[in-house]
């Protein structure tokens, strides 16, 4: 993810800071554009949380997958509350990082929630991640891994 997040830092729902490059290396990355005040975001986030948990947190062998939340919330407190209430143990771009706006433009985010699945170089695998998870569940992940050119023996 050097190409799109570079030397940036990401945060956890507990407030810890991690280096984006180390946290996202050799993983399929889902950029999750959402906000607490958005009813469709509040509806989809628990489903994404279950998807993430099944692939990463509770898996015998964690999948090469990470979600990066790109908040459209009105304040850092609103973002943090949303993360603590409904999110999985995934990462987020800090609220005060202006790069949030650049990512929205780069990935043509005109409505939320939107889940954009990207390769390590930032190239889009699909901008319909939300729809694919709703329709296909865990089965869509294998397609993402193959498209991401991550050579790892993984099966759902």
UniProtKB/Swiss-Prot annotation:
UniProt-listed GO biological process terms: photoreceptor cell maintenance; sensory perception of smell; visual perception
Protein's name according to its UniProt entry: Nucleoredoxin-like protein 2
Function: May be involved in the maintenance of both the function and the viability of sensory neurons, including photoreceptors and olfactory neurons.
Domain Thioredoxin: 9-147
UniProt family annotation: Belongs to the nucleoredoxin family.
Pfam short name (any one): Thioredoxin_8
Gene: NXNL2
Species of origin: Homo sapiens (Human)
């Amino acid at each position: 993810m050097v190409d799109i997040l570079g030397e940036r830092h990401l945060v956890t729902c507990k407030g810890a800071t991690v280096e984006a490059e180390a946290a996202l290396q050799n993983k399929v990355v889902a950029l999750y554009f959402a906000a607490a005040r958005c009813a469709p975001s509040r509806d989809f986030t628990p489903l994404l949380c279950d998807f993430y948990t099944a692939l990463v947190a509770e898996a015998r062998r964690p999948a090469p997958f990470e979600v990066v939340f790109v908040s459209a919330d009105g304040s850092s407190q609103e973002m943090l509350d949303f993360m603590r209430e409904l999110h999985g143990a995934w990462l987020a771009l800090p609220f005060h990082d202006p790069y949030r706006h650049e990512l929205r433009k780069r990935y043509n985010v005109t409505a939320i929630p939107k889940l954009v699945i990207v390769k390590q170089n930032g190239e889009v695998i699909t901008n319909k991640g939300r729809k694919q998870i709703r329709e296909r569940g865990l089965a869509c992940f294998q397609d993402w891994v193959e498209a991401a050119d991550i050579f790892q023996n993984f099966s759902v």
